[in-house]
Amino acid sequence: MPSAVKLAGPAIHPGKVLADELAVLNVSPSQLARAIDVPVNRVTQILHGRRAITADTALRLGRWFGSGPEIWIDLQTDYELRIAEAELGKTLLAIPVRG
């Protein structure tokens, strides 16, 4: 049975994680875009937190990094849950736990 758990820490957009990884590898956004066959603006929008990582992008990133898509989808899901939790605030706390 699911339990209510407050997510810890700030919401970190997966674009920040991607930017950090690219910096370590010394890979530019345009190099990544070419490598995963997407428009460069998709990559730059993700890097700037203006675009979500979709299943399509997660599959491409997972293939290129050799890590699988799950890490990228999980980062996006975690980010969205933290944002939603912060937005719902007291409304969420007012919902009774069944049981």
Predicted regions and their residues:
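A short, Lys/Arg-rich alpha-helix, primarily the initiator
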Residues: 2-27, 74
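A general alpha-helix detector
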Residues: 17, 42, 57-60
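The DNA-recognition helices of helix-turn-helix-type DNA-binding domains
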Residues: 25, 39, 50, 65, ...
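Short, basic-rich loop-to-helix N-cap that marks the start of a DNA-contacting helix
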Residues: 50-63
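Glycine-rich, small/polar surface segments that engage phosphate groups of diverse ligands
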Residues: 69
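Short, charged recognition helix plus adjacent turn
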Residues: 63, 73-99
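The alpha-helix within a helix-turn-helix
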Residues: 22, 33, 62
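Short alpha-helical DNA-recognition segment
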Residues: 27-45
